[in-house]
UniProtKB/Swiss-Prot annotation:
Pfam families: M20_dimer, Peptidase_M20. It comes from Schizosaccharomyces pombe (strain 972 / ATCC 24843) (Fission yeast). Its EC number is 3.4.17.-. Its main location: membrane. Glycans are attached at N118, N466, N541, N555. One of its GO terms (biological process) is protein catabolic process in the vacuole. Binds 2 Zn(2+) ions per subunit. It is found in: Vacuole membrane. Its cofactor is Zn(2+). Residues 1-37 are cytoplasmic. This is Uncharacterized carboxypeptidase C24C9.08. The chain crosses the membrane at residues 38-58. Zn(2+) 2 binds at H197, D232, D295. Keywords: Carboxypeptidase, Glycoprotein, Hydrolase, Membrane, Metal-binding, Protease, Transmembrane, Transmembrane helix, Vacuole, Zinc.
Amino acid sequence: MSTSNDPVVSSHDPIKQEKEQETDLEAQVEHKKRNERGNAFVGFLILIFVYYLLRGGSNDNDKQEMSHSPGSCMDSESAAVSTSAKCYIPPVLTPAKEPKLGDDVSGIDYIRSPEFFNDSLVRFQELLRIPTVCYDDMGDVGDDDRFDIFAVFQDKVRELYPNIFKKLKVEYVNTYGLLITLEGSNKDLKPLVLMGHQDVVPVNQASLDRWYFPPFSATYHNGHVYSRGAADDKNSVVAILEALEILAISDYKPEQTVIASFGFDEEVSGYRGALPLAHKLYERYGKDGVALILDEGGFTINLFGTLFATVCVAEKGYMDVHLKLKTPGGHASIPPPHTNIGLMSKLVTQIEEPFGGELTFENPFYTTLQCFAENSADMDDNLRQLIKSGDTEKMTDLFSKSRLYRYFFETSIAVDVINGGVKVNALPEETTLAVNHRVDASKGLKQVYDRYGGLLEEFGHEYHVNVTLFNGETVVEYEDAIGHIFASTAKTLEPSPVSPYDESSDAYKKLAGAIRYTFGDGTSVTPALMPANTDTRHYWNLTSNIYRWTPVSTNSTSKNSFNGHTINENMRYDAHMDSIEFFYNFILVSDSGEEA
């Protein structure tokens, strides 16, 4: 694990120069911090969810819902340890060989040097300052000039990492997809693929006055680098580049091929970036032709007195449902019992009825809880007892009382967009509705299709409205109908396969072994479920070993932790250094790891 050494102080020290400029900002920044509530970070980060819920950081409703003791859900005599899900923690793995930069400087020593600490910061900042923003309405590459900024980004990558471009194979896929290959000597070994994405989400212009520093300034302040993209996902992209550059400088010749695959539109589902990259790899290596894929995902956090690294081994499914209701217009002085908007509002209240869910042994979240209970130093005894009992019915009842927990085993419902009406005093003729669902991994998209099929048919009969479902079939049809509702979908994705995380998986052993080597042998590597989706959705045919984990540690009690996708996004710089060290270690361990 990298040391948190302060930057070297010299006449040319960029951090010192920035710190001097920041001194006058200290008071106002701290004032802003005291007057702003930090977000819980990205909703899909399981450990932060767990910490806030069980440590009292969730909202008041959640605290009230969970205030009763978990012990009240069960008799103490019934607490038998479940054998349905084991918390397997692989051994620490160390590299059998390590490259040298010169006669007596190892790669890891160089990464931990003050010189590298300073120089790497400058490179990180330079790439963060390029606003590689991806918007929901992006057109195709070549037709939409908003993609041109990625050429600027890649020119800077070429300038900052010259040895990668001199010694490794670099390819551009669909213009801006970046594929870097460090060829291995043993062609019988399947390659290791490290993923990241170059794009970032837009900055809400109305929020600029709430940023401590301009969102693309990449300002270093109090050990943090503030910038859009610092946490999602340029931290990983830059860390992988740093690791590969060091290996290129050292002329490292691995047995296993190592590939970096960087998309450029992950924030809008990756169809122009990750999908063509995945196709290229499939053409080259074939079905199941890759050993392991690692992309962004869970974090490492100190929870219940233990350091947990939550490696997401699966993702929930995804569906956007679009509904369009058409009715006759007219003068508002003679309205029907329900206007178009009124009818759609009736439907919304029905749509928002929860799906309900059930925590099953097969759900990775069940194993997450088992690992917490088995390895945490100071978890509440009643909660530990409940989890280890394996009583999924009582666990479901308890955890479903909080919105922070329930969506790890239940399909979510978010009515996000509604539009209707054009003028006061004119009856609306059309209302549209968009609903987002993250689909329960145990149910699949069929659950959502079936739910809407029944719900819309019942709605149509109740309000005398014709109904056409997703497949174009009209299931309710009246000659004198007062309207017609149409259902369609835009983006859909079945829940991902579950990647292996037991003793039989060499891939999981290597990943977990490298994590524990980097972050310490006291780290509990824990499988988890990803409620959100990543670019890995396009890579399923390449391997069954797909893992989602971001190699940084975070302190969830800090209001200043990362803030991905929102104001004051930042990365603790020592956490970024840990990322570099991890990717460097992981490449070596995957190639030649041995038990410590």
